[in-house]
Amino acid sequence: MALLKTMPIIRSLTRGKSIRLLQKQSTKRTNPCVYLEAKAVEQTPATEFNSILQEIISTEYNYSVDLKKTLNEIIMPIEGQSMEREAIGICTCFKTLNQLHTKLYQQMISSGSPVYSLSQSLPAFRDVYHMYTINLSGISAIEKIISDPSSCNSQLLIPLQHLLRYPIHLARVCKMLRKYPFLNGDFRMAVKTLDDFRELCSYIDQEKAREESYQVLSALCGNQGVAVDIPRHIKFKGSVIPATSFIYDFNACVFCDDGLVVWTRYVKKIEMKAVSIEQCLRVDELSNSILVCTLNMKGKLLNRHLAPQTMAASVFLKWYHERAGISNGKENKLNRLKVVNAKT
């Protein structure tokens, strides 16, 4: 009975201890957070700079893992199969890409300087990524033979997306070295590497645009005798509204920066079929329409009237004004040279 009488007292005492213990634990849990915040405030330039370098290395490691995953899931299972030439090309390029980044990650670890490793690997980057870009058409060929084509496109485009990260990382490195010259890093090398990678990304983007333009024009023109092997940048691909008094059998167009115009019924690449392939000669802005004078493949002159204040019309006008400005600039320069020569 005595024991039973003392039980409530023991329970109350233990309950009080439990509450005090929980209070102590809660304060202990908040202490590390406070310490981390204080530490973050007191972070030195050297530790911040080293964290950026480590981030570059860890990003390269994750990228290498993604490449190996794609290699094992997509490339290797179809290697022994009969494939189109485009599919073989993209597979070969991807394997070379995987080797490049595996070696690059190892160099970053051994040298401890990811910026130096990137600067040394730049020539290989140019060759490998250029070849990979011009073989992108092989992705659609691979999608036809793999069991799960839904993930193929996204996984095989990862290299071009990852390439854009290098200038971002290098810009952060340059910013730190410019702000804190005492840091252990070669500022000139970092700036040059950043400029080279920016130039490479711009070049690859242009190559990708050329390749996409080539694929669209190839699908449209087929075997109609158009020299689609000439690099052309597509300026406009979209709906066209003919002027109200004129009716044509097309409702969209592909317009290239060299003046090639392909009239088509649909905008989507799969449904695109060329109605007429023409070369743009002149563009005039009339009161009720935009007049586009063209020459078709049979040598016949045509007048296309587009509705004003539309996307297609504005693109035609902009292209024509830019081209006219360039030609006028060349003529003025030649005239000035003639005047100078006459005076001398």
Swiss-Prot record:
Residues 48-207 form the DH domain. GO terms for molecular function: guanyl-nucleotide exchange factor activity. One of its GO terms (cellular component) is cell division site. This is Meiotically up-regulated gene 10 protein. The keyword Transferase does not apply. Signal peptide: none annotated. It comes from Schizosaccharomyces pombe (strain 972 / ATCC 24843). PROSITE patterns: DH_2 (PS50010). InterPro entries: DBL_dom_sf, DH_dom.
